[in-house]
């Protein structure tokens, strides 16, 4: 391990935190960066472990809301329905992710061209949804009905394809099912907590014999950068999308996907 490895870990942690909660696919960005810049020393297990920084970022920002949910849960039926809705939305990813884990890691994660194509397709979808004259029926995540939560959960499973984006799929699904932009992004935040925690725990178990103690410093640096940048994004994203929508992220995806695809076609 040298200074370059630490800078690499810091850069990857920064990218993870900045892109995890916005609809641009953090996994897709990390895979493309690893492919084009040759960041191989940390490996894909490292990329999973630094997600813990992003998980703790959202838990930190949402600590007051989570505490209120915890205290209201025993006596408030609306709060219980919301928590049950999050669990229902999480179940499809938990089941399908466990069953398809090997295929996802060994095939989908090794196909950078697929990442670029999904980034481009997702960019067009975001731009399309953003300009629709939708009439939202739900302005508070607490009011999402259980069938809607389950549908969002199945839509989230599309994000097992790198480049699709977990937050992008859940936000688009929520919007098309009647949510407004702010609550769609917030529901994506809440759903990220069990989904990311579950993926982290499962990948950590699967990779328990791969990481060595020598990787501790790299993971620590990546974790800190993912946490700091993740806190920044979570704090400001809801206000941003309420005012400006998702157009910026649609163009972001189109540019990154197109540049990546062109580079793959030219240099491989």
Curated annotation (Swiss-Prot):
Disulfides per UniProt: none
Stretches that traverse the bilayer: 3-23, 46-66, 84-104, 107-127, 144-164, 184-204, 218-238, 248-268
UniProt keyword annotation of Nucleus present: no
UniProt main location, coarse: membrane
EC number(s) recorded for this UniProt protein: 3.6.1.27
Catalytic activity of the protein: di-trans,octa-cis-undecaprenyl diphosphate + H2O = di-trans,octa-cis-undecaprenyl phosphate + phosphate + H(+)
Location within or outside the cell: Cell inner membrane
Annotated function: Catalyzes the dephosphorylation of undecaprenyl diphosphate (UPP). Confers resistance to bacitracin.
Protein name according to UniProt: Undecaprenyl-diphosphatase
Organism: Brucella anthropi (strain ATCC 49188 / DSM 6882 / CCUG 24695 / JCM 21032 / LMG 3331 / NBRC 15819 / NCTC 12168 / Alc 37)
Record lineage: Bacteria, Pseudomonadati, Pseudomonadota, Alphaproteobacteria, Hyphomicrobiales
């Amino acid at each position: 391990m040298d200074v370059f490895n630490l800078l690499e870990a810091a850069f990857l942690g920064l990218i993870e935190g900045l892109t995890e909660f916005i609809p641009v696919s953090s996994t897709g960005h990390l895979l493309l960066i690893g492919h084009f810049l040759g960041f191989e020393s940390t490996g894909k297990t490292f990329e999973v472990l630094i997600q813990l920084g992003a998980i703790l970022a959202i838990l930190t920002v949402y600590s007051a809301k989570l505490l209120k949910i915890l205290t209201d849960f025993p006596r408030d039926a609306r709060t219980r329905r919301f928590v049950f809705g999050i669990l229902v939305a999480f179940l499809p990813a938990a089941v399908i992710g466990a069953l398809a884990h090997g295929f996802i890691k060994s095939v989908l994660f090794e196909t950078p061209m697929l990442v670029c194509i999904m980034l481009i397709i997702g960019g067009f979808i975001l731009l399309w949804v953003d300009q629709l004259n939708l009439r939202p029926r739900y302005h508070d995540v607490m009011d999402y009905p259980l069938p809607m939560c389950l549908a969002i959960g199945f839509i989230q499973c599309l994000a097992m394809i790198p480049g699709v984006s977990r937050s992008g799929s859940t936000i688009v699904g929520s919007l098309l099912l009647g949510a407004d932009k702010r609550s769609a992004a917030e529901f994506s935040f809440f759903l990220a907590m069990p989904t990311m925690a579950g993926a982290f725990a499962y990948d950590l178990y699967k990779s328990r014999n791969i990481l060595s103690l020598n990787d501790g410093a790299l993971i620590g640096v990546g974790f800190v950068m993912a946490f700091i940048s993740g806190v920044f994004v979570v704090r400001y994203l809801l206000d941003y999308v309420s005012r400006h929508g998702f157009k910026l992220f649609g163009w972001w995806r189109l540019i990154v996907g197109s540049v990546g695809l062109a580079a793959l076609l030219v240099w491989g």
